[in-house]
Amino acid sequence: MTGERSARCDALIASWGSGGNLPPLLAAGALLAARDLRVCVLASSATQQAAVDAGFDVVGYRRARDPDLKTAFEDQADRAMATAAGLEIALDVRDAVAELKPQLMIVDCMLPAALAAGEAMGTPTASLVHFPYGLARTQMLRGAGAWTTDRAQLNDTRHALRLAPAADALAAWESPDLLLVTVPKWFDLPTEYPAKVVHAGPLGVRTEPRRSGSAKQPLVLLSFSTTVMHGQPGLIQRVCDAISGEGLRAILTLGPAVSGEAIRIPGNVEVVPYADHDQLLPRCAAVVTHGGLGTTLRALAHGKPMLLLPLGRDQEFNARRAGELGAGIHLPLGASPNEIASALGELLAQPSYAEGAERAAAAIAADRPDQTATEALLGLAKIKFE
């Protein structure tokens, strides 16, 4: 179903932006669908196809504008944050809740207007946080503001919904009934968290027994951001130049943010628009990445060491943590092809990095992320967990 709202659903997912926001939302929905709950997704043009492909019923926004996928977030931050906190999104979510009558909502944490709508409708609402929440919470506790909240616009929206204003950034972020963080607590920044903050870890990871490729031709996954980021084409080119001529094979997942025509691809690199990382990673010896949280945690869940070259946002933190865990090497964005080749050679030659990644994989498995998330979400809606 696309665009229709004639039937009820048990859980409504409010999505808007793509990139790293979307996969954990859909993974959370899949966990509920596996419990025989009917899950619907409120989707923009950026998220609709992925939601349909995941098997969910999809309804569209009626008032809210679509996100701008051609511009880096940093270049449109004020506009994007105002839209995400704006009344149009809130009214669309309110209408969807009124018509579909879900028992709970799961909302992208970057959509404060949708969270406010859930509060106004009295629907149990979970904010799905897809980055290390400790970073944001520590910043807000210092009174240094919040990364992604236009509080003035949000309070205008809350006023229109007859809600009290958010007193500060932390109050805005922690207004939902549950903050479900898709990061292991031991990976996040150590700080105090209220009980409503639940660290589950990466959701929907499908691990397999380890499979090693040829020792002479190890396979390396090259995975970068699916959204536009400054410096990304140059980084991908330097990584490809570093790998050219090396005794290895690589698969480059080149998403919609970078055109393949802009990159000189060496003969030992296969380019694909998309790959199922859970199927691919068991064959890989290592991962080269910008350090986005989704790729970082999935590599760790599969016990794969990483070479990380952060582009920005939370990626510096993720790369640093991977290094502290002994599971990766962290290089600056401007590293040369020679420096990248040298670091990758060390990563593949020194077994300590693979051992560090295996320890992280065991820790993630012990956390039981899917069960933790399912229990938290069903508990929020007071649905019996079996």
Question: Predicted segment positions?
Answer:
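Short flexible/disordered coil segments
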Residues: 168-172, 228-237, 313, 317
